[in-house]
Curated annotation (Swiss-Prot):
Keyword Ubl conjugation applies: yes
GO cellular component: prefoldin complex; RPAP3/R2TP/prefoldin-like complex
Protein name in UniProt: Prefoldin subunit 6
BP GO annotations: chaperone-mediated protein complex assembly; negative regulation of amyloid fibril formation; protein folding
Similarity section: Belongs to the prefoldin subunit beta family.
This protein's record includes keyword Chaperone: yes
Length: 127
């Protein structure tokens, strides 16, 4: 019986480790999005300082291409909306992964107790 519990425990530990990896990836992704959000907010602020007489360029591959100020502002606004939506999605994903991780920890604790009880019950029989 202890061997069955031990195998189940190993499987649950692997699930928990995978959840921790997923959690780490999601946190890393969210941090990248936060950096992009900050960058784009700075660009938005800089574009707000310009008037119609200023010339704006965008980088397309290795080439700078002239862009209308209104178009540049709209592009940055859309990018900010997208990044904000992605951050919300990541936050939701992080909450789910944290909840699953907590449930997995509880399952592991229960299995460890079962395993210890099985080991204790097995030990007096051998003596």
């Amino acid at each position: 019986m202890a061997e069955l519990i031990q195998k189940k425990l190993q499987g649950e530990v692997e699930k928990y480790q995978q959840l921790q990896k997923d959690l780490s990836k999601s946190m890393s992704g969210r941090q990248k999005l936060e950096a992009q959000l900050t960058e784009n907010n700075i660009v938005k602020e800089e574009l707000a300082l310009l008037d119609g007489s200023n010339v704006v360029f965008k980088l397309l591959g290795p080439v700078l291409v002239k862009q209308e100020l209104g178009e540049a502002r709209a592009t940055v606004g859309k990018r900010l909306d997208y990044i904000t939506a992605e951050i919300k999605r990541y936050e939701s994903q992080l909450r789910d992964l944290e909840r699953q991780s907590e449930q997995q920890r509880e399952t592991l604790a229960q299995l460890q107790q079962e395993f210890q009880r099985a080991q204790a019950a097995k030990a007096p029989g051998k003596a």
